[in-house]
């Protein structure tokens, strides 16, 4: 590719020093937990992706090494190796000075992800050690850093090479990442696979060299976002082949791919310069506006909508739609709303996407007449269903107080005394007997109890109007009081935490899954905000002695049980809990409800695409994918009820025996 290489020493601009990064890492990577740890990798990978995005290189390799460090290698141009205007080697400037990156000069990149340039130095500052190896101009150069970014060597020429590119290896600092410095293959694979879908020329290889965890995955999609849509819709009944539109407008490149399926919810994923905009923005608005306008015009042209009929709503048109919107915006036009860069603010992007879709979609609808007519009819059906559900939703919102009173009068909800919605907790408890113990054992100031008596509907396969007919779900909607579906407003929630408390058996697990499916599909902001939890009652109670000498201990896993048995010695009584109802109110409070001693699992969505696919696989209509997934992931043994804590894949995100973060 014959391009002028303007990625030179003087195109790197220096803005400020690095001192603040180690003091306040959260300002730069969001957090110092598992999420922040993996963010370090994305920062380096995004620099390599920017090279590919601008036409240099086509391969990135990410390797988790045996010692727990990680290497990211690309075949781009290689970082500049000369002396910077400040008098230091340019590579050293890139890795030791905040905001020293190609993005900030005009010569380096035409388009790049929003954080490019900050990445390298922040990663260095938060690493125990870092090593960079550069292949450029026929030479290999290396430089080492230690103790959070201090140069251990200068930039040294170490050999000859015929290739170009950059390799960065680093080990995260355990003083910063106190909870974990262990990389998770699956978390990395989700983000890397996404990048490969968005850049069809790019091949990404992810390798794990750690003992007992060895594996490798390669991501390379020649059809790009077309394959991305197929991936998201896997396991669903699709109504047509994936459709793609591409075009330019206002200097912005637009790529759109979409496909309808037989489900009732929409899934729109948008990206700017290969970075996910999870909160949408102007590009999504442009897509939705054009789609709604073109569909309504077409529906009137084929006489499915008469003059007296009102226009179809965008939500109705998008029912069952999966779409990927990818835009590439020149650096000078790039604007985000807020600090997180998760919502695009560039106004030109709206008109760019609108004009590309408005130009191409009418031709597509005309060409696929039969399909288009069925999609219009599908939208009209959705409109009718929405009207039916609207009344129920209005009851849920405008009649909130009356309904809440009705719920109280019907004896279901035992409310908290406090009106402090920032502190109040709602326990959804399986069955009446456990609900009774929970009512007596709770802290009535801030804990409310809602026993679930009947059958919870599988919301993956149901329309909203049917969901409102399910008494258990309806009661939950009214109790939380923040609406449902597209009307859900997290700020209206009556509770800061929703805690699901069920027996530790297969029925309990099934209820958990049904409730989580509902929250994921119809109250997603609650899950995204980390406000849905699963309570973890103990599996065993051990008792020894009598009267004043009586000792009572609880165990949550077989390992804990073994340790307690050794500690207590002989002569103890062991009780295996089969259900919550076997505990008296004091025991339930002490083990499962007391913020000082309880253990909660916070339900978190790391990757919405994969979570959504998993929900479809496990809760959808198709039996074969479900059987295949269960055979691959579930081990059937002789143990009747194994603790969830024994599963190494489940992360206990909040063990409140040790930490309890209260909002005052």
Curated annotation (Swiss-Prot):
ATP binds at residues 7, 47, 74, 114-120, 341. SUPFAM superfamilies: ATPase domain of HSP90 chaperone/DNA topoisomerase II/histidine kinase, Ribosomal protein S5 domain 2-like, Type II DNA topoisomerase. Binds two Mg(2+) per subunit. The magnesium ions form salt bridges with both the protein and the DNA. Can also accept other divalent metal cations, such as Mn(2+) or Ca(2+). Pfam families: DNA_gyraseB (PF00204), DNA_gyraseB_C (PF00986), HATPase_c (PF02518), Toprim (PF01751). InterPro entries: DNA_gyrase_B_C, HATPase_C_sf, ParE_type2, Ribosomal_Su5_D2-typ_SF, Ribsml_uS5_D2-typ_fold_subgr, Topo_IIA, Topo_IIA-like_dom_sf, Topo_IIA_B. It is an enzyme of class 5 (isomerase). GO terms for cellular component: chromosome. The keyword Transmembrane helix does not apply. Residues 386-418 are annotated as: Disordered. CDD domains: HATPase_GyrB-like, TopoII_Trans_DNA_gyrase. NCBIfam families: parE_Gpos, PRK05644.1. HAMAP family: ParE_type2. Heterotetramer composed of ParC and ParE. Topoisomerase IV is essential for chromosome segregation. It relaxes supercoiled DNA. Performs the decatenation events required during the replication of a circular DNA molecule. This is DNA topoisomerase 4 subunit B.
């Amino acid at each position: 590719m014959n391009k002028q290489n303007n990625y030179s020493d003087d195109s790197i601009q220096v803005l400020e020093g690095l001192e603040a990064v180690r003091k306040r890492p959260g300002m730069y990577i969001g957090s110092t937990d598992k999420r922040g740890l993996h963010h370090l990798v994305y920062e380096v990978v995004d620099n390599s992706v920017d090279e590919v995005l601008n036409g240099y290189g086509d391969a990135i390799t990410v390797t988790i090494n045996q010692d727990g460090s990680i290497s990211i290698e690309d075949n781009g141009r290689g970082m500049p190796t000369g002396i910077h205007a400040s008098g230091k080697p340019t590579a050293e400037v890139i890795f030791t000075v905040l905001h020293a990156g190609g993005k900030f000069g005009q010569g380096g990149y035409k388009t790049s992800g929003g954080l490019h340039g900050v990445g390298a130095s922040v990663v260095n500052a938060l690493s125990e050690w870092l090593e960079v190896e550069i292949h450029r101009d026929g030479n290999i150069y290396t430089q080492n850093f230690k103790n959070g970014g201090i140069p251990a060597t200068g930039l040294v020429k170490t050999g000859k090479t015929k290739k170009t590119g950059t390799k960065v290896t680093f080990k995260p600092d355990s003083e910063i990442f106190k909870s974990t410095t262990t990389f998770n293959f699956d978390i990395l694979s989700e983000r890397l696979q996404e990048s490969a879908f968005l850049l069809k020329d790019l091949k990404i290889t992810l390798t794990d060299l750690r003992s007992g965890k060895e594996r490798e995955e390669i991501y390379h999609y020649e059809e790009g976002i077309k394959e991305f849509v197929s991936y998201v819709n896997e396991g669903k009944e699709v109504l047509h082949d994936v459709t793609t539109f591409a075009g330019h407008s206002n200097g912005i490149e637009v790529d759109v791919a979409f496909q309808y399926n037989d489900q009732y919810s929409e899934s729109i994923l948008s990206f700017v310069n290969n970075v996910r905009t999870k909160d949408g923005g102007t590009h999504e608005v442009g897509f939705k506006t054009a789609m709604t306008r073109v569909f309504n015009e077409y529906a009137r042209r084929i006489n499915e909508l008469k003059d007296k009929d009102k226009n179809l709503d965008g939500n109705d048109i998008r029912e069952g739609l999966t779409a990927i919107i990818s835009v590439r915006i020149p650096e000078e036009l790039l604007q985000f709303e807020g600090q997180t860069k998760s919502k695009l603010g560039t106004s030109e992007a709206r008109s760019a996407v609108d004009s590309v879709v408005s130009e191409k979609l009418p031709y597509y609808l005309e060409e696929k007449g039969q399909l288009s007519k069925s999609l219009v009819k599908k939208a009209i059906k959705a409109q009718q269903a929405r009207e039916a559900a609207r009344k129920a939703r209005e009851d849920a919102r405008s009649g909130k107080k009356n309904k809440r009173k009705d719920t109280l009068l019907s004896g279901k909800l035992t409310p908290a005394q406090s009106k402090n919605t920032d502190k109040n907790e709602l326990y959804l408890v399986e069955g009446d007997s456990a609900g009774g113990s929970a009512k007596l054992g709770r802290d009535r100031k801030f804990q409310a109890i809602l026993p679930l008596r009947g059958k919870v509907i599988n919301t993956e396969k149901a329309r909203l109007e049917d969901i409102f007919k399910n008494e258990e779900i309806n009661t939950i909607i009214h109790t939380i009081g923040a609406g449902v579906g597209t009307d859900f407003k997290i700020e209206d929630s009556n509770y800061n935490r929703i805690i699901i408390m069920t027996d530790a058996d297969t029925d309990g697990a099934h209820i958990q899954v049904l409730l989580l499916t509902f929250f994921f599909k119809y109250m997603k902001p609650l899950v995204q905000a980390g406000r849905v939890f699963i309570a973890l009652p103990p599996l065993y109670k051990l008792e020894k002695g009598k009267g004043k000498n009586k000792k009572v201990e609880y165990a949550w896993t077989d390992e804990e049980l073994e340790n307690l048995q050794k500690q207590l010695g002989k002569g103890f009584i062991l009780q295996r809990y089969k259900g919550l109802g076997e505990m008296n109110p004091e025991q339930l409070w002490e083990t499962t409800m007391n913020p000082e001693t309880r253990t909660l699992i916070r339900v978190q969505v790391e990757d919405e695409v994969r979570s959504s696919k998993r929900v479809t696989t496990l809760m959808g209509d198709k039996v074969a994918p479900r059987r295949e997934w269960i055979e691959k992931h579930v081990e059937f043994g002789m143990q009747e009820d194994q603790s969830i804590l024994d599963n190494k894949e489940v992360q206990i995100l909040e063990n409140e025996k040790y930490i309890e973060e209260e909002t005052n």
